[in-house]
Curated annotation (Swiss-Prot):
The gene coding this protein: uidB
InterPro entries hit by this protein: MFS_2, MFS_trans_sf, Na/Gal_symport, Na/Gal_symport_CS
Gene Ontology BP terms: carbohydrate transport; sodium ion transport; transmembrane transport
Source taxonomy: Bacteria, Pseudomonadati, Pseudomonadota, Gammaproteobacteria, Enterobacterales
Keyword NAD found: no
Name used for this protein in its record: Glucuronide carrier protein homolog
Membrane topology designation: Multi-pass membrane protein
Family, as annotated: Belongs to the sodium:galactoside symporter (TC 2.A.2) family.
Periplasmic side: 35-37, 101-108, 168-180, 250-263, 317-320, 394-408
Species this chain originates from: Escherichia coli (strain K12)
Length: 457
């Protein structure tokens, strides 16, 4: 439990999430708008596609988790995927923004499905081992909290940078001009992403000792089945991700049709990510040390709920107050997103404590499965609300559409953050219990190692 990690290792690990988000954040920020306003895919078709493919991605996570748990190489279980899986991922991150505008609508939809599914599968085969790697680097709670904070900051900075780089380029641009912008930036980001993944690979090591051999699929599933804290955390994560992606998918529509100024898109993303997540993530290790991971999550969820409720009421009549409300909500959301990674890592030890079986890959994949479902639901809710309210691309919108956009960006996230608070209120794995579990696991390993040594001698 004493594996203290250097800042070089922590920063190197976080660069992997920068690379992750070159593919991931582009989709969250721009893909729905690209499909509807540039590629000419209908809002309802785009929303359905985003929902179905992200559900496919969720199942791809489970497949990837099992693949990861079955691998053991001279580089470890997880690091090889960062080395060999990145090129296909980055290629698909370019292809999803390459819908040819002169195709028929049906051809565009088929191409969107195929390329987005390919992106999701490749992302799972890189992101699952990347996330699982944290559980193998250390069992020390503060170091795990720092890893979570570092990747949270890295992801948020990536969101902000992409918004500042690409947002102004598409401001007041025609659909034809936007095509060139998306093509240029996706290629640049793909090359940079491969470099950053390699740095992450070289900067990290797997330090947690494993004694038990790779378990069968049946034993692995039985281990998951008994892990009640993992299932509760997954449901809480589902709610937080629905909230997060409802905001991300609605932001461009909010600034374009409610505020009537796409130039404010970068400001909105800046407040949501830099002021929110980057401001909150450094606070999390200290909060964890003082009040524990569970209470840290609860404070974040409550702050997010109140912030989004205020944002809804002021989202039209006062932009400065609306930005303050969004900042409050984003700080709360940032706290929950950051501490979530440390909570997930703890559930690996809980499963090992109950059954003697350590399955980082499958545990993380189930956690990621529910996160992907949250992304799917949260990302598609705005599309469905737009369709139901009568949205027509690139036109002056009706009051019903404006209310739909406000609901998507504020009320939907408010409700799901409140639900996350209620669920984690009953979360059973406290920091005190976790420390007892790690001590027990270490004692078991010492006994097993001694038995192996005695038999060998």
């Amino acid at each position: 439990m004493n594996q203290q990690l250097s800042w070089r290792t922590i920063v190197g690990y976080s660069l992997g999430d920068v690379a992750n988000n070159f593919a991931f954040a582009m989709g969250a920020l721009f893909l729905l708008s690209y499909y509807t306003d540039v590629a000419g895919v209908g809002a309802a078709a785009a929303g359905t596609m985003l929902l179905l493919v992200r559900v496919f991605d969720a199942f791809a996570d489970v497949f990837a988790g099992r693949v990861v748990d079955s691998v053991n190489t001279r580089w470890g279980k997880f690091r090889p995927f960062l080395l060999f899986g990145t090129a296909p991922l980055m290629i698909f991150s370019v292809l999803v923004f390459w819908v040819l505008t002169d195709w028929s609508h049906g051809s565009k939809v088929v191409y969107a499905y195929l390329t987005y599914m390919g992106l999701g599968l490749c992302y799972s085969l890189v992101n699952i081992p990347y996330g699982s790697l944290a559980t193998a680097m250390t069992q020390q709670p503060q170091s795990r909290a720092r890893l979570g904070a570092a990747r949270g900051i890295a992801a948020s900075l990536t969101f902000v940078c992409l918004a500042f780089l690409i947002g102004p380029s598409i401001k007041n641009s025609s659909p034809e001009e936007m095509v060139s912008v998306y093509h240029f930036w996706t290629i640049v980001l793909a090359i940079a992403g491969m470099v950053l993944y390699f740095i992450c690979f070289k900067s990290t090591r797997e330090n947690v000792v494993r004694i038990v051999a790779q378990p069968s699929l049946n034993i692995s599933l039985q281990t998951l089945k008994r892990n009640r804290p993992l299932f509760m955390l997954c449901i809480g994560a589902l709610c937080v991700l629905i909230s997060t992606f409802a905001v991300s998918a609605s932001s461009l529509f909010y600034v374009r049709y409610v505020l009537n100024d796409t130039g404010l898109f970068t400001v909105l993303v800046l407040v949501q990510n830099l002021v929110g997540t980057v401001a909150s993530a450094p606070l999390v290790p200290g909060m964890v040390a003082r009040i524990g991971k569970k209470n840290t999550f609860l404070i974040g969820a409550l702050l997010g709920t109140c912030g989004y409720l205020l944002f809804f009421w002021v989202s039209v009549w006062s932009l400065p107050v609306a930005l303050v409300a969004l900042a409050i909500a984003s700080i709360g959301q940032g706290v929950t997103m950051t501490v979530m990674w440390a909570l997930e890592a703890d559930t690996v030890e809980y499963g090992e404590y109950l059954t003697g079986v350590r399955i980082e890959g499958l545990t993380y994949s189930l956690f990621s499965f529910t996160r992907k479902c949250g992304q799917a639901i949260g990302g598609s809710i705005p599309a469905f609300i737009l369709g139901l309210s009568g949205y027509i691309a690139n036109q002056v919108q009706t009051p019903e559409v404006i209310m739909g956009i406000r609901t998507s960006i504020a009320l939907v996230p408010c409700g799901f953050m409140l639900l996350a608070f209620v669920i984690i209120w009953f979360y059973p794995l406290t920091d005190k219990k976790f420390k007892e579990i790690v001590v027990e696991i270490d004692n078991r390993k010492k006994v097993q190692q001694q038995l192996i040594s005695d038999i060998t001698n």
